[in-house]
């Protein structure tokens, strides 16, 4: 009462049954479509990685099999290759790379985006399917974020890419509809 949050508490309490239902009922995932999306993303990842390796040819050490020894997973690895190639971006944040005129910035940015999709939304995502009903039962946190917004974890359904490739995987099963 002191903070005048009665209305907020009322809204939060009213939303609780909906969150509980979402967690308990789960979310249908079209696994065949998900596998297709993952395969397409993997192909894009390989394409972006090849473009990155071409861009920084000669700056990455090779392993015993002649393959590039870097997985380009860390900023330090990317910065080291950039320095060897005579390119010095201010930093590797997307916002910074978008302002760079050097075409290598775009190559780095596209690779990192494809790598992020591969890491967060690959076949590993399917481990969240419940064995009993084949649905995803995420954990919703109504007021966990500092911003006051709700969050979702295990998995983070709010972080699913906003592309038809991924969003279409959350289709209603036959005879049902999703209302958004």
Language model region names:
Residues 180:
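C-terminal substrate/ligand-recognition segments
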Residues 1-165, 171-177:
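Conserved "right-hand" nucleotidyltransferase catalytic core of DNA-directed polymerases
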């Amino acid at each position: 009462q002191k903070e005048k949050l009665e209305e907020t508490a009322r809204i939060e309490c009213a939303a609780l049954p909906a969150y509980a239902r979402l967690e308990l009922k789960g979310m249908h995932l079209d696994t065949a479509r998900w596998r297709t999306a993952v395969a397409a993303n993997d192909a894009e990842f390989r394409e972006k990685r090849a473009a990155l390796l071409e861009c920084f040819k000669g700056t990455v050490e090779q392993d015993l099999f002649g393959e590039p020894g870097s997985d380009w997973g860390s900023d330090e690895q990317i910065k080291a290759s950039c320095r060897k190639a005579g390119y010095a971006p201010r930093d590797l944040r997307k916002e910074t790379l978008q302002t760079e005129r050097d075409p290598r910035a775009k190559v780095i940015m596209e690779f990192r985006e494809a790598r992020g999709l591969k890491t967060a939304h690959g076949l590993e995502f399917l481990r969240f399917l419940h064995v009993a009903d084949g649905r995803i039962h995420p954990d919703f946190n109504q007021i966990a974020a500092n911003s006051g917004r709700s969050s979702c974890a295990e998995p983070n359904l709010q972080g699913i890419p906003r592309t038809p490739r991924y969003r279409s995987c959350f289709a209603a099963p036959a005879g049902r509809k999703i209302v958004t």
